[in-house]
Amino acid sequence: MARAEARFVVDRPKGEVLAFLGDPVQVGGCLAFVANTEKTAEGVRWKVKAPMSAITQTPHLDVVFRVEGDSVHWQGRGRHLEIQGTFAVAETLAGATEVACTLEVLPLGALAPVLGPLAAAQVSGQLDYFVREARARLAP
């Protein structure tokens, strides 16, 4: 499993940040590999952008979000990929909100030996992109 971690601070109340991070549409909009978010009868689905969808043969990820206290855990599973993330939020002494993030990518099935090195090479860049986008969207 490929894994990356990051932290960032935004000048917004903790409740607003937690609501943003608990929303699959908002989080999907901050991930470079997500083309759009669809609501289905089963739940929420992220459509995976090309070329990632073609390379991984994973056109979409079925996503589940869970908010528990001051943290959010989400998991997206598709044909050959499982991607999950966690966010833990805390108020700083200055009244801003700090977010600790993790992103994990687990290749599945017959393509796992091929996708494993690709995931390891890209997971940090994917999380960096998320942090930039989330900070921009949460800016006052």
Name what the model sees in each region:
Residues 14, 39-40, 64-70, 88-98:
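A short, structured loop/turn motif at beta-sheet edges
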Residues 119, 123-139:
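Short amphipathic alpha-helical signal-transduction/dimerization elements
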Residues 1-7, 43, 58-60, 71, ...:
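Intrinsic-disorder/low-complexity, polar/charged segments enriched in Ser/Thr/Lys/Arg/Asp/Glu/Gln
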Residues 1-43:
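Hydrophobic ligand-binding cavity/cleft-lining segments
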Residues 17-21, 27, 44-46, 63, ...:
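Hydrophobic pocket/interface hotspot
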Residues 9-13, 49-51, 66, 90-92, ...:
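Solvent-exposed residues in well-ordered beta-strands and their adjoining turns
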Residues 38-80, 133-140:
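Glycine-rich portal/gate segments that line the openings of hydrophobic small-molecule binding cavities
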Residues 75-125:
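Beta-strand/loop substructures that line and gate deep hydrophobic ligand-binding cavities in soluble
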